From Swiss-Prot:
Regions crossing the membrane: 28-48, 92-112, 137-157, 213-233, 249-269
Record's protein name: Probable peptide ABC transporter permease protein y4tQ
UniProt similarity note: Belongs to the binding-protein-dependent transport system permease family. OppBC subfamily.
Swiss-Prot/TrEMBL GO biological process terms: amino acid transport; transmembrane transport
Domain called ABC transmembrane type-1: residue spans: 88-276
Annotated function: Probably part of the binding-protein-dependent transport system y4tOPQRS for a peptide. Probably responsible for the translocation of the substrate across the membrane.
Record-linked InterPro entries: BP-dependent_transpt_permease (IPR050366), MetI-like (IPR000515), MetI-like_sf (IPR035906), OppC_N (IPR025966)
Pfam families with a match to the protein in the record: BPD_transp_1 (PF00528), OppC_N (PF12911)
Protein origin, superkingdom: Bacteria
Membrane topology of the entry: Multi-pass membrane protein
Location of the protein in the cell: Cell inner membrane
Protein source organism: Sinorhizobium fredii (strain NBRC 101917 / NGR234)
Gene3D superfamilies: MetI-like (1.10.3720.10)
Record keywords, A-Z: Amino-acid transport, Cell inner membrane, Cell membrane, Membrane, Plasmid, Transmembrane, Transmembrane helix, Transport
């Protein structure tokens, strides 16, 4: 009983020590992940401390920051601070879900391409064709056919990002499938699904996580760009791209209407990139030494 109690009481200290050790060895993971976690918490708790981002008051157009309106108001009298905070929800949702969709699709297609010589050439030629089309242009084409919407926006961003993930996973599968322990497992009678699950898929996770961070950052920027030109998030939904587009004519009068969403967009993308760099250094220490 005493031994069990000692272990139970020591476990939090062990976990704390592990977190501190990771923070010391990989500060980029702590910095990028901390900023991203803070942004997520602020976005989730927005109703607790900010106003309604949709309420318009024509008598409070383009007002300067005040105690009730921390970032002032836009050209329609809406609270810029509230719209900036709620806009974080859109950017984070689109970025994270686009990265997840691209990662899942790229993982499945990449494994098939890496292990099936029959479909490898067909799949990779299709991926090459998709990669030859600029992401922004392909997303605009898809959104033009369906109209604006968050769901279709996520799909439109994920599709052009999938080929890069597919090529990465395929290269890992081709490398791992020829290793002795994989061949030994197959010769020992292990079935292919079991070999994929136990030996090959775990090898794809670290590079897939790093690539997903890159996709997430790219998706956030793409969403902002598409919303800026009016084909992304519907105009009635608060979005950093919409805010910048609607306020660009009032930069001299109310600079915070552009600076607030622009700064949040830059910080979010920077945090995701820092997290991706930190994960790369964590999974591949040689990359850190080369730099």
């Amino acid at each position: 009983m005493a031994l069990t109690t000692s272990r139970a009481s020591g476990s939090p200290r062990i976990q704390t020590h592990t977190v501190v050790r990771i923070a010391k060895r990989h500060p980029l993971v702590l910095l990028g992940g901390g900023i991203l976690l803070l942004l997520i918490l602020l976005a989730l708790a927005a109703p607790l401390y900010s106003g309604d981002p949709l309420v318009m008051d024509p008598f409070k157009r383009l007002q300067q920051p005040s105690a009730s309106m921390w970032f002032g108001t836009d050209n329609l009298g809406r609270d810029v601070f509230a719209r900036t905070i709620y806009g974080a929800r859109i950017s984070l949702i689109v970025g994270l879900l686009s990265a997840v969709c691209a990662a899942v699709c790229g993982l499945l297609i990449g494994v098939i391409a890496g292990y099936s010589r029959t479909f490898d050439n067909i799949i990779m030629r299709v991926m090459d064709g998709l990669m030859s089309i600029p992401t922004f242009l392909l997303a605009i084409a898809l959104l033009s056919l369906t109209g604006p919407g968050i769901g279709i926006l996520i799909v439109a961003i994920a599709i052009p990002e999938t080929p890069a993930v597919t090529r990465l996973v395929r290269s890992v599968v081709l490398s791992v499938r020829s290793r002795p322990y994989v061949e030994a497992a197959l010769c020992g009678g292990a079935r292919l699904p079991r070999v994929l699950w136990r030996h090959i898929l775990p090898s794809t996770i670290p590079p897939l996580m790093v690539q997903s961070a890159t996709v997430c950052a790219s998706a956030i920027m793409t969403e902002a760009g598409l919303s800026f030109i009016g084909v992304g998030v519907p105009s009635e939904i608060p979005s950093w791209g919409n805010m910048i587009a609607n306020s660009r004519l009032f930069l001299a009068i109310a600079p915070l209407t552009i600076f607030a969403p622009g700064l949040c967009l830059a910080v979010t993308v920077l945090a995701v990139n820092l997290l991706g760099d930190g994960l790369r250094d964590m999974f591949d220490p040689r990359s850190k030494r080369r730099r």
